[in-house]
Amino acid sequence: MAAKGRMRRIIRTARSLPTALERLIVVLEHRYTPIARFRPGAFEGWGFLWQPAVLGFIALLLILAGSCFVESPFKLGLPRTWFFGAPPSLAATNLPTNETKLMIAISLTYGGLVLLLRVWMRLAEVVKLHAGAPDRVLYCIVALWSIPMLVAPPLFSRDVYSYAAQGEMTAHGISPYIMGPFSLGSSPFVDPVDPLWGNTPAPYGPLFLYLDGLIVRSTHHNQLMSTVGLRLLELAAVALLAYALPRLARALGRDGGEAIVLGALNPLVILTLIGGAHNDALMVALLVAGLMFAARRQLWLALLFCSLATAIKAPAALGLVYVAWTWLVPGANERVTRVREFPIVVVRMIRTRLRPLVAGAVMSTVTLLICTYLAGFGFGWVKNLATPGTVRSWAAPATALGMAITGLCHSVGLDVSMTPILSVTRLLGLLTAVGISIFLLWRAQTRGWVRSLGMSLLLFVVLGPVVQPWYLVWGLLVLAASYQGREHFWLLALSITSPFLGLPGAHDLLDGLVNAPLLLMAAALIVLMGALLVPLGRWTQWSWPEVDDRLERLGLTAE
């Protein structure tokens, strides 16, 4: 009984955490930001949208300006990797770093990032409380915010250079499933590749390799133009995402404008999928398009698009499972009231689902076979799916647990290897994600199958061997069209905090602020504090119609 009581208290505490966090945020914003002086007012229509559009554009221009410096730590500092902001020669990379330019670059980038997150969070709250934002205007904002990231060099990651090198390998008939980019020898495609992935085979699906090689061939094997082509491919994917998200949301009975803001305008999408040119954009865009068709009961198109998404990156296969499993004949769902009924109900449900499961398997198999034939390198990508796990990061809970256990053992004098411990903790994380995902799949019809899919994708990322900001978009973009209740808070929280995962330059910024000349220090602080505290405009009051009630419950007043 005592154990049951403790378990109930733990569950009660876990359920109260979102409320406690929300109250803490309300108190902090009331006391330390300009929101305290706003009084809720009547909503005056959507004419104000130009204000967040311009503010977000300015924020992204600050990030672009920060990337223009050769010293910027947010991009690759090698010659001929972009049209500007690159050193003139390889010898110039060995010159001493200009500390002044380094701090300016970091201050501009961090200031722009903070301002962008503030603008987006307020806009997300406005469209949540006032449905009906026009798609056409929001599409214009997506286009406007994309411009600085199209001009900027690839930011926050060097993965796009690996894509280009793998495309060059594909164009020359070298299998990226067997060899790494360093097999190209002295090719200009090799220099920008992160050494961590230089000898690592590709884990990407055959469709992406086919498109990758096609882009390299169409640019006549020019490394810089291949990088541009890959970014344009991801931009097209974001355009497809912006088209499919509101239609998926409306098919689920939700507001399409809010889905665009939470999805296509999400800072993670703008910064990592367009700015970083990650192929996750193509995968998740095809997946969301497939979910849109599934919500409209157009199963064959849904299976086709989900299969194409799987041929980009394997995690999209989870979408295939959900689409096939939830395509039901009438009366296919049954509830289990007694334990002995469980086998009977399982057999009955499998029979009713046999047709969609077989159809899904056939469609996905045929699509993958065609893509594999076009790429011409077989199914080697399947055995390479664990490649990202070579990274050891504290951002992944399963990996962090293994590293912490290893460190603890070393501190008490036990000489243990980290590799087997990491294997165990990562396996436990994977099994936990699989177990919860099976439960979500089983209850998909009652909990909302698109929402359950989004949660499953997030689980596999958070409990996986490595967590990257662009991995989180898999689940966040699906939840953008299907979330319920407090999931909105967690969606915002993940979107706002994850851009800072592994973001470089923080140490350099703090060191520069301590040691910089007084005038430069003052200028950097003005940029950073201005981005954090500058009033966004009176349109933000429409995102807080409930703020008075919440403050009263906390014993505060909105004066």
PLM feature spans:
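Start-transfer (signal-anchor) and selected internal transmembrane alpha helices
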Residues: 1-61, 89-148, 445, 450-451, ...
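Transmembrane-helix motifs of polytopic, lipid-linked glycan transferases
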Residues: 111-122, 228-252, 284-285, 435-441
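Intramembrane catalytic core of multi-pass membrane enzymes that act on lipidic substrates
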Residues: 131-231, 235
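Transmembrane-helix signature of polytopic, membrane-embedded enzymes
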Residues: 132-140, 245-267
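Specific aromatic-rich, kink-prone transmembrane helix
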Residues: 240-244, 283-298, 457
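Aromatic/glycine/proline-enriched transmembrane-helix motif characteristic
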Residues: 369, 386-463, 538-559
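Aromatic-enriched
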Residues: 483-559
